[in-house]
C-alpha cells in the first residue's frame, strides 16, 4: 500500500488513454502480505514492496518458486513519537530495549516520567518484517491490541493502529509516515544521532535505510521486464524522486 503513489504515477506516465476500469483490471492495491501471496500463486506478475521476510522466502521455496528482487529506490524505516515528547533521538539499542520492554518509561531516556506505549504493526506487513530485522532476533514484546467492529456485526481482535498519545512510539516507512498518512502531531526521531533525511537515506548514513524492490518470479514476463527497465531508467528514477521516495543514485 505504501508504494501506491510511485506505481500509480508510473501508470499515468507510461500508458495513454487508460480509464478506471482498465486500472481496476491491471493494477492491484493491497497489503504487502496479500500481494505477495498473489505473486507466488501466479495471480499477479509483479509486486512493489520492501524485502520479504524469511518466512515469505521460505513460503515461496515451498511452492517451488524462486523470487527475483530488483531494487528501484531507497526508503527509511522510521520511528515517531508525539511532537510534544522531548525525546528527539534514540539509539538502535534503545529501540530494541523499548520493544523488549527492558525500558518501559520515557524518564530513563531523558524524557518525562511516563510509561512508554510501544505500538507495532501486524505480522506479515512490510513494516513488521523490517522491525523484526532491526530487533536482530531479540523477541518483540506482545503488541498492543484492540477490538474492531466489522461491517457485518462481527468483532475481531487485532494489532492496534498507532494512537498518538503523549507517551506513544510507533514505526513505519518514511513515505507512509510523512506523506500518505501525515500527522502533524508526530515527529520522527533521529537514530544514533542521524536524521532520516533524503541525503542520509541515499548515502546510507541513516542506519535503518534500505532498498525497496520490484519483485517477480524467476522468469518475469516481457511486459514486467519492460516496466522494470523503465523504472531503472533516468525517467523512471526521476519519477521515484518526484513521488517522494529516494532514488538509487543522486539525479
Sequence positions of predicted segments:
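Exported/periplasmic ABC-transporter solute-binding proteins
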Residues: 1-75, 80-251
Amino acid at each position: 500500500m505504501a508504494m501506491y503513489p510511485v506505481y500509480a504515477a508510473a501508470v499515468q506516465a507510461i500508458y495513454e488513454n487508460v480509464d478506471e476500469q482498465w486500472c481496476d483490471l491491471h493494477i492491484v492495491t493491497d497489503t504487502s502480505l496479500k500481494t505477495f501471496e498473489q505473486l507466488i500463486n501466479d495471480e499477479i506478475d509483479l509486486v512493489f514492496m520492501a524485502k520479504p521476510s524469511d518466512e515469505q522466502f521460505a513460503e515461496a521455496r515451498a511452492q517451488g518458486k524462486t523470487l527475483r528482487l530488483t531494487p528501484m529506490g531507497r526508503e527509511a524505516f522510521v520511528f515517531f513519537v508525539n511532537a510534544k515528547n522531548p525525546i528527539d533521538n534514540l539509539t538502535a539499542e534503545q529501540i530494541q530495549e523499548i520493544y523488549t520492554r527492558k525500558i518501559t518509561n520515557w524518564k530513563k531516556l531523558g524524557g518525562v516520567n511516563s510509561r512508554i506505549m510501544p505500538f507495532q504493526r501486524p505480522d506479515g506487513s512490510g513494516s513488521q518484517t523490517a522491525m523484526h530485522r532491526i530487533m536482530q532476533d531479540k523477541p518483540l514484546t506482545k503488541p498492543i491490541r484492540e477490538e474492531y467492529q466489522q461491517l457485518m456485526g462481527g468483532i475481531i481482535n487485532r494489532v492496534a493502529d498507532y494512537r498518538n498519545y503523549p507517551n506513544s512510539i510507533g514505526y513505519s516507512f518514511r513515505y507512509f509516515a510523512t506523506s500518505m498518512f501525515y500527522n502533524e502531531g508526530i515527529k520522527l526521531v533521529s537514530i544514533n544521532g542521524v536524521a532520516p533525511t533524503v541525503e542520509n537515506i541515499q548515502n546510507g548514513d541513516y542506519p535503518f535505510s534500505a532498498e525497496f524492490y520490484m519483485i517477480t518470479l524467476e522468469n518475469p514476463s516481457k511486459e514486467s521486464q519492460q516496466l522494470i527497465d523503465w523504472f531503472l531508467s533516468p525517467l523512471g528514477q526521476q519519477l521515484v524522486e518526484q513521488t517522494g521516495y529516494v532514488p538509487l543514485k543522486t539525479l
